């Protein structure tokens, strides 16, 4: 309820705390409705309650509707490092070309991703979604929900080895972000990554276009140099068309 705005729908997620305990407070703060699995005892039956069997499934249904309604470009970002910073930098650049909506903070899990979709104004030109993982088979369903036009894999490292047996498994999981891409979609990958070749192998299984970037001379978009000046980072790059 802390971030609730007047007119918002309150999602009563059951996690470490039961969101149903805060429905009454949400209505006091101006919520237009609440998505719940049951009616809380301290809430009148006359209040606008959207009662579903499972709040998480209900949230995903709302997110799916929001995605189908959205007509702008969708970019999904994953990787072992740099997801949030990449999201913020990309949002800054794209703001010169239209209205941008991006995931708040690190909203990148099974709750944060659908919340991002639901909160996206339908008149936005761009939506940037961050997709993270803690365990196996988490990225694919989120990519299917998001249906991005462009996917970005920042890098693959040993950051998730607590849940995976090897970096190979992590690379495979990260490549699953391509599941939601259509055949004309693009996956952007760092050519400087130690796992680049492995990522390309897995990404090719989805039949999407691969765009590489980095300092490696074989990069499609090659970074020549970066300079920090007047509290700004300036980059010089060679684009594919020169």
Q: Positions of the model-derived regions?
A:
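N-terminal leader/targeting and accessory segments in enzymes
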Residues: 1-61
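Hydrophobic residues at beta-strand termini and immediately following loops
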Residues: 52, 103, 213
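Adenine nucleotide phosphate-binding catalytic loops in nucleotide-utilizing enzymes
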Residues: 49, 167-168, 201-204, 208-242
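Short, polar loop motifs at secondary-structure junctions
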Residues: 34-42, 191-194, 215-216
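ATP-dependent carboxylate-amine ligase
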Residues: 3-9, 14-19, 149, 163, ...
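Phosphate-binding loop of NTP-binding sites
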Residues: 57-191, 195-206
């Amino acid at each position: 309820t802390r971030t609730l705005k007047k007119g918002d729908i309150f999602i009563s997620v059951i996690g470490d705390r039961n969101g149903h305990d805060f429905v009454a407070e949400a209505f006091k703060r101006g919520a237009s409705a609440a998505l719940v699995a049951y009616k809380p005892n301290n809430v009148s039956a006359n209040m606008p309650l959207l009662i579903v069997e499972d709040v998480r499934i209900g949230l995903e249904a709302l997110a799916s509707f929001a995605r189908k309604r959205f007509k702008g470009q969708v970019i999904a970002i994953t990787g072992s490092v740099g997801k949030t910073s990449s999201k913020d930098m990309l949002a800054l650049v794209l703001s010169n070309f239209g209205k941008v909506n991006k995931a708040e903070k690190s909203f990148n899990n099974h709750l944060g991703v659908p919340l991002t979709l639901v909160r996206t104004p339908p008149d936005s030109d761009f939506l940037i979604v961050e997709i993270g993982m803690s365990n196996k088979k988490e990225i694919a369903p989120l990519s299917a929900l998001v249906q991005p036009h462009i996917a970005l894999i920042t890098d693959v490292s040993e950051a998730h080895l607590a849940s995976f047996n090897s970096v190979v498994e992590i690379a495979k999981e990260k490549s699953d972000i391509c599941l939601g891409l259509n055949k004309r979609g693009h996956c952007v990958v760092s050519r400087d990554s130690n796992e680049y070749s492995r990522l390309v192998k897995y990404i090719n299984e989805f039949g999407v276009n691969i765009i590489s970037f980095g300092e490696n001379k074989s990069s499609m978009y090659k970074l020549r140099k970066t300079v920090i000046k007047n509290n700004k980072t300036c980059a010089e790059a060679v684009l594919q068309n020169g």
